[in-house]
């Protein structure tokens, strides 16, 4: 048992509660939290980007979605941790409730849970007479020194809108304000980025906007935020319950007013023409970086996953990337069955017949994240590799070319239905088909998935998103093919022009329509 488990259980006893929810996120509710700031990682040893843990005096449950089923099993100590593998459509709150006794008390950190999640916990667990208690402290957290941010302003020719124009679109009335705590929204509104961060370029802070003024709290001034928000005299402060923490919402008290549709979310996800043009240039550079890496795999022997990752990121810099938009995935053979594998080991040597899955992206001068996935083969593939690759390619082509959709879940259904019917034995598609892209590599809306609120948002022109079907089988391999796309005149267009691997395509499995669709993409 590690020291953090002991700390969690000591907290249960001291506070006289039965359960503690330990989060993967931080005070800004980010998706990709640094491991050094990730309490759930300290508690469980699991390094995935999402997934929370439930602690009781006798058990610890780790809840993970399909991307992390295999990885969680590999990383946790099963003597201490029980991995709960969520399936598509499972609701994590329902799974939490199943593992809690009636008439018990759950403690959560108010600074690491949104108001929306807090209220849903109260509602769901209330059905079992479970009380949810808020705490301002996280007993697992390891405090890290704060580094002053070095901020870069993105020029108008790359954003298409000034900060003032974006704030005016908030349409606030006299003595009204809006609180923005989502880092991507903050970066978008201010046209600022912090390129010194690893795998992200969002600025860190919180801001309040009024009709004619804005108040930004960051670095040293962030400590003044609680006092400001508690004592502000605005009649109304609008908040997005999905992104405001329960702590900040409580501080606002009666001044807080939930908005049904966040105006920043709406304007951020519909890209300007300048942003689209920047994206086209950024993806052309990303394509080149990945294509040269594929050539490196083909032309060199006795290279490792680590060597390929080094070459990949060198190529990104060569073509103008300021940094990576997430931790690059370079996964050979059975490692590619882990959707978010990120070890890139020096010990994993590429051999004849090896598959290499690369999922990567970068940031360029415009501060928008690129994202692409391709699979390469060293030498000649076997029949199963070709069959799985071609099946995934067919799913991509069908989803990319569909015109029968209103929202993201409609496109997801096209690929999912096909893969459910045609996947080779044991191979599964266990994640959403795609996600929005923008300041962050994962932006919402849109989302191409099933049943989430953002997958039901109508798709509009200039929305940008990925299409990334995949098939995975533990101890065998995984195939994922990902293009980042945008909507134009209600048709899906691809930013990505990176070729597909001809050696891995079984053309006998393609019908004439699929061959015609494929002809619009480079195959070599």
Write out the residue ranges for each language-model feature.
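Active-site neighborhoods and metal-handling regions in enzymes and metal-associated proteins
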Residues: 1-524
């Amino acid at each position: 048992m590690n020291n953090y488990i002991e700390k969690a259980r000591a907290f249960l006893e001291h506070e006289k509660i039965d359960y503690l929810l330990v989060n993967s996120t931080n005070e800004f509710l980010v998706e990709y939290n640094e491991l050094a700031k990730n309490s759930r990682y300290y508690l469980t040893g699991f390094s995935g980007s999402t997934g929370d843990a439930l602690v009781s005096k006798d058990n610890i449950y780790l809840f993970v979605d399909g991307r992390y089923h295999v990885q969680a099993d590999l990383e946790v100590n099963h003597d201490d941790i029980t991995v709960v593998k969520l399936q598509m459509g499972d609701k994590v709150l329902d799974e939490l409730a199943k593992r809690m006794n009636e008439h018990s008390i759950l403690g959560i950190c108010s600074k690491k849970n949104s108001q929306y999640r807090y209220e849903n916990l109260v509602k769901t667990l209330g059905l079992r007479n479970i009380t949810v208690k808020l705490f301002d402290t996280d007993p697992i957290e390891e405090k890290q020194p704060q580094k002053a941010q070095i901020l870069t302003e993105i020029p108008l020719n790359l954003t298409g809108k000034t900060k003032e124009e974006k704030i005016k679109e908030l349409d606030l009335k006299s003595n009204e304000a809006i609180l923005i705590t989502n880092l991507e929204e903050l970066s978008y509104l201010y046209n600022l980025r912090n390129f010194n961060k690893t795998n992200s370029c969002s600025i860190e802070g919180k801001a309040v906007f009024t009709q004619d003024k804005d108040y930004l709290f960051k670095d040293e001034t962030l400590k003044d935020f609680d006092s400001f928000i508690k004592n502000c005299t605005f009649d109304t402060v609008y908040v997005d319950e999905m992104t405001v923490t329960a702590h900040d919402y409580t501080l606002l008290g009666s001044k807080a007013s939930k908005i049904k549709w966040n105006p920043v979310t709406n304007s951020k996800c519909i890209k300007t023409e300048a942003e689209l043009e920047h994206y086209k240039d950024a993806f052309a550079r990303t394509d080149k970086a990945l294509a040269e890496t594929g050539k490196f795999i083909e032309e060199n022997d006795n290279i490792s996953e680590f060597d390929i990752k080094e070459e990949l990121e060198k190529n990104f810099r060569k073509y103008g990337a300021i940094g990576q938009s997430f931790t690059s995935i370079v996964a050979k053979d059975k490692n590619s069955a882990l959707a978010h594998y990120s070890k890139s080991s020096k010990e994993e040597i590429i051999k004849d017949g090896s598959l290499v899955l690369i999922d990567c992206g970068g940031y360029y001068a415009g501060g928008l994240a690129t994202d692409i996935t391709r699979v390469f083969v060293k030498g000649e593939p076997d029949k199963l590799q070709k069959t799985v690759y071609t099946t995934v390619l067919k799913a991509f082509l069908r989803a990319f070319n569909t015109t029968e959709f209103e929202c993201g879940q409609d496109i997801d259904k096209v690929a999912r239905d096909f893969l459910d019917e045609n996947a080779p034995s044991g191979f599964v598609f266990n994640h959403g088909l795609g996600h929005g892209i923008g300041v962050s590599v994962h932006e919402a809306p849109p989302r191409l998935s099933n049943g989430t609120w953002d997958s039901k948002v109508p798709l509009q022109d200039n929305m940008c998103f990925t299409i990334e079907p995949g098939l995975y089988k533990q101890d065998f391999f995984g195939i994922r093919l990902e293009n980042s796309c945008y909507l134009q005149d209600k048709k899906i267009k691809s930013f990505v022009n990176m070729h597909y691997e001809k050696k891995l395509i079984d053309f006998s499995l393609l019908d004439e329509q699929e061959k015609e669709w494929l002809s619009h993409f480079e195959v070599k």
